[in-house]
């Protein structure tokens, strides 16, 4: 499949079984899915902004995003129920592993003034979320062709029962946590 998946199967599963005292391979936590979300506040006034965000997310993820719509009207933000306000992609299978590898090996090292990712971003159930301020850290995005720099949220959903297990899993992939 991919090098990260092969590495997970051959090395990480055995290592985590020993560390967590599991008797079955099925108990070992794994990455279930990766969700990319790009909220576009200016989409309510200009439809072209949302189209460009969809193109960026398509290039980053390799699959067509789902356009998210406002659940309720908010007068302060000038949006009404049903207005398109962003886009999201859920990655599973081979695309999940390909993206995860590109995120760790290529994208995160390109973040300006990077000092490691916070360990406080776990949700209590073993899932990790991080925010990217600039989509240009991904090599698929051509800096000269983007209309504006926009960020995105990345959520890594795992089958881990606790934050400790999820941190062990992600650290096994050399995920750059802050010391």
Swiss-Prot record:
<dbReference type="GO" id="GO:0000049">
    <property type="term" value="F:tRNA binding"/>
</dbReference>
<dbReference type="InterPro" id="IPR002132">
    <property type="entry name" value="Ribosomal_uL5"/>
</dbReference>
<dbReference type="InterPro" id="IPR022803">
    <property type="entry name" value="Ribosomal_uL5_dom_sf"/>
</dbReference>
<dbReference type="InterPro" id="IPR031309">
    <property type="entry name" value="Ribosomal_uL5_C"/>
</dbReference>
<dbReference type="GO" id="GO:0019843">
    <property type="term" value="F:rRNA binding"/>
</dbReference>
<dbReference type="GO" id="GO:0003735">
    <property type="term" value="F:structural constituent of ribosome"/>
</dbReference>
<dbReference type="GO" id="GO:0005840">
    <property type="term" value="C:ribosome"/>
</dbReference>
<dbReference type="InterPro" id="IPR031310">
    <property type="entry name" value="Ribosomal_uL5_N"/>
</dbReference>
<protein>
    <recommendedName>
        <fullName>Large ribosomal subunit protein uL5</fullName>
    </recommendedName>
</protein>
<dbReference type="Pfam" id="PF00281">
    <property type="entry name" value="Ribosomal_L5"/>
</dbReference>
<comment type="subunit">
    <text>Part of the 50S ribosomal subunit; part of the 5S rRNA/L5/L18/L25 subcomplex. Contacts the 5S rRNA and the P site tRNA. Forms a bridge to the 30S subunit in the 70S ribosome.</text>
</comment>
<keyword id="KW-0699">rRNA-binding</keyword>
<comment type="function">
    <text>This is one of the proteins that bind and probably mediate the attachment of the 5S RNA into the large ribosomal subunit, where it forms part of the central protuberance. In the 70S ribosome it contacts protein S13 of the 30S subunit (bridge B1b), connecting the 2 subunits; this bridge is implicated in subunit movement. Contacts the P site tRNA; the 5S rRNA and some of its associated proteins might help stabilize positioning of ribosome-bound tRNAs.</text>
</comment>
<keyword id="KW-0694">RNA-binding</keyword>
<keyword id="KW-0687">Ribonucleoprotein</keyword>
<dbReference type="GO" id="GO:1990904">
    <property type="term" value="C:ribonucleoprotein complex"/>
</dbReference>
<keyword id="KW-0820">tRNA-binding</keyword>
<dbReference type="InterPro" id="IPR020929">
    <property type="entry name" value="Ribosomal_uL5_CS"/>
</dbReference>
<keyword id="KW-0689">Ribosomal protein</keyword>
<comment type="similarity">
    <text>Belongs to the universal ribosomal protein uL5 family.</text>
</comment>
<dbReference type="InterPro" id="IPR020930">
    <property type="entry name" value="Ribosomal_uL5_bac-type"/>
</dbReference>
<dbReference type="GO" id="GO:0006412">
    <property type="term" value="P:translation"/>
</dbReference>
<dbReference type="Pfam" id="PF00673">
    <property type="entry name" value="Ribosomal_L5_C"/>
</dbReference>
């Amino acid at each position: 499949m991919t090098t990260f998946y092969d590495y997970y199967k051959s090395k990480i599963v055995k290592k985590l079984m020993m560390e967590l005292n599991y008797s079955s391979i099925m108990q070992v936590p794994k990455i279930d899915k990766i969700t990319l979300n790009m909220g576009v506040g200016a989409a309510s006034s200009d439809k072209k902004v949302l189209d460009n965000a969809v193109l960026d997310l398509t290039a980053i993820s390799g699959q067509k995003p789902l356009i998210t719509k406002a659940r309720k009207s908010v007068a302060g933000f000038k949006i009404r129920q049903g207005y398109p306000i962003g886009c999201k992609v859920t990655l599973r299978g081979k695309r999940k592993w390909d993206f995860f590898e590109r995120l760790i090996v290529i994208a995160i090292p390109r973040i300006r003034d990077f000092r490691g990712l916070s360990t406080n971003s776990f949700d209590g159930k073993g899932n990790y979320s991080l925010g990217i301020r600039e989509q240009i850290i991904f090599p698929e995005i051509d800096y000269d062709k983007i209309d504006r720099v926009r960020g995105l949220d990345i959520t890594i959903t795992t089958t881990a029962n606790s934050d400790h297990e999820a941190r062990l899993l992600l650290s096994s992939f050399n995920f750059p946590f802050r010391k």
